[in-house]
Regions:
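Helix-coil-helix junctions within alpha-helical repeat/solenoid scaffolds
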Residues: 1-206
Length: 206
């Protein structure tokens, strides 16, 4: 929860303890995903190389256990880690894989997050396909609204706002960013509002 709220410093000790407990208590079922999430937290904390190595390790462990049903969230973590590291094509490929796996096993929440990652990895390309990226965001948003995933709803509106802002579509960008800001504030997610406010200011300055 802390990680999705953007509070990496509070998330890290919780995740490190979870991995330690899985190892010391010999709980292999949950270890791969906990390792992957911890790696993502390290990447968010700026420890790119160490974090990527951990996420990749978590995915490899999950693959080795042959539990494809549990693979989608680990693959999504890897996609997000690659995204943060600027490895956009790898992020896009892994996001597509996570979407397919989540759809196959009817994991709609995982599918929603993976669709958002498809939007992000498409939108951040040097010459993004705007409508393709927007379509991924809107698919993710529709699922997030249906499932009550409000943090993801906010992320989708933020992604759309940034995408439209870079494309010169000021009115649409302003509407999406304003919605994102309202959602983040209503959930007291303090990490993102400054980013949204900066994006809004940039849109107004264009």
């Amino acid at each position: 929860m802390y990680l999705r709220q953007g509070d990496v410093q509070r998330a890290l000790p919780v995740l490190e303890r979870a991995v330690g407990l899985c190892q010391s208590w010999h709980i292999p079922l949950f270890l791969p995903i906990e390792v992957a999430i911890l790696g993502l937290a390290y990447v968010l904390d700026g420890r790119i190389d160490a974090g990527l190595a951990l996420v990749e390790q978590g995915v490899e462990q999950q693959v080795a256990r042959g539990r494809r049903r549990r693979l989608a969230p680990a693959i999504a973590c890897l996609s997000e880690a690659y995204l943060l590291a600027g490895r956009l094509e790898e992020a896009r490929q892994r996001a597509a894989q996570a979407v397919d796996l989540a759809h196959q096993y009817q994991q709609r929440g995982n599918q929603a997050w993976a669709l958002w990652l498809r939007g992000e990895s498409t939108a951040r390309q040097a010459s993004p396909e705007v409508e393709l990226a927007a379509g991924h965001y809107r698919q993710a948003l529709a699922l997030a609204e249906e499932l009550g995933m409000r943090p993801l709803q906010a992320h989708c509106h933020l992604g759309l706002g940034n995408l439209y802002g870079r494309s010169g579509r000021r009115d649409e960008a302003r509407a999406e960013l304003t919605t994102a800001l309202e959602l983040y504030r209503s959930m007291e997610m303090s990490f993102w509002p400054p980013q949204v406010e900066a994006a809004l200011a940039e849109v107004e300055a264009r």
